Amino acid sequence: MLESVGISRIITLDIHSEQIQGFFSFPVDNIYNSNIMSKAVSDKYNVDDLQVVSPDTGGVLRARSVAKTLGVQDLAIIDKRRERANESEVLNIIGDIDGKVCIVPDDMIDTAGTLSNASHALKDKGAKEVIAFITHPVLSGNAIENINSSAIDKLIVSNSIDIGDKSKKCPKIDVFDISPICLLYTSPSPRDVVPS
């Protein structure tokens, strides 16, 4: 169906499930925005002070990619149980986070309940700071209240979803402009331009 209207390639930004790429008969490129957002901390911290933490087992590839971008050798993983949507319980943290600035990359944040629980668990286990990189800030329901009362020190979100004045209600939120990334990946390269 998409081919019938001239679409020959799709570019996604932190796709929620990479398996979706296999459902198309043409290339689907996924850009890990959290790698680009990692520049927001790479100049502020010594790499030895950082620990990248996957918020769950499903986010390990994203976290490993961010760790590689930052030059962080090890990875920590939050083992959690999810009873229902927007509710989770941290069972264990696998990896060394004591005294570390923990970077938690994820594709989206909805009510912030899961990230709030994770931030408290990380601080309880000795994390010095918790910084989250989130590509798609849904921020529904009581998300702002959850973030404000969480142990998150900084929440860096992209502007893939306009959050309006929510960042004014939460001093922990920094918005990262992704328009240069979108321009880079959507501008035709010289080989794609048809001479007139």
Regions found by a protein language model. Give the residues of each.
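Short acidic, glycine/proline-enriched helix-loop-strand junctions
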Residues: 18-40, 145, 149-154, 160, ...
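Conserved beta-strand scaffold positions in the cores of enzyme catalytic domains, especially
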Residues: 10, 28-30, 52, 75-77, ...
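Hydrophobic alpha-helical segments within soluble ligand-binding/sensing domains
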Residues: 1-5, 31-50, 179-187
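PRPP/pyrophosphate-binding module of the type I phosphoribosyltransferase fold
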Residues: 4, 42-43, 48-168
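Single conserved hydrophobic/aromatic residue that forms the stacking wall/gate
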Residues: 185-196
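Proline-rich low-complexity regions
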Residues: 27, 55, 188-190
